[in-house]
Amino acid sequence: MTADILRPEPGTRTVFRWRKWDGGPHWVHDCIYLGHDRWGEWFGQPEGTRSFRPGREVLTRAASVTLVPPSGDHALTVNVAPPASSRIYIDLAWDVRWSDTEVGVPTGIDMDLDVVRAVDGRGTWID
């Protein structure tokens, strides 16, 4: 995710569009672009923000921040937990980058392999 021309200003509302490996739709997260630094691109979701995919729509139970490193091979989300059931959620991904067709919109392929650290005693596991 290094295309400066496609990067919005910090504080800009945007959507993060995930897709399945076959190109089908997956999660879409309403979020706020927070900025970038040497670690990557930062996105925030305040409590009550909408996330949806085919067949499911949720409002976030807690605020979160997501980091996408320059490698574009994963997205690390840190949740305020509780009330969220997980503190850490890592989506292993492919081709996470700024969209070529929508200015200021991050997109990526969700590999459906995640690392989760729960706060309810389940510990850390691979989903």
Question: How should each PLM-predicted stretch be described?
Answer:
Residues 33-35, 68, 116-117:
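Well-ordered beta-strand positions
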Residues 26-30, 61-63, 72-75, 108-112:
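Short, surface-exposed coil-to-beta transition loops
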Residues 41-82, 89-99:
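Catalytic core of tubulin tyrosine ligase-like
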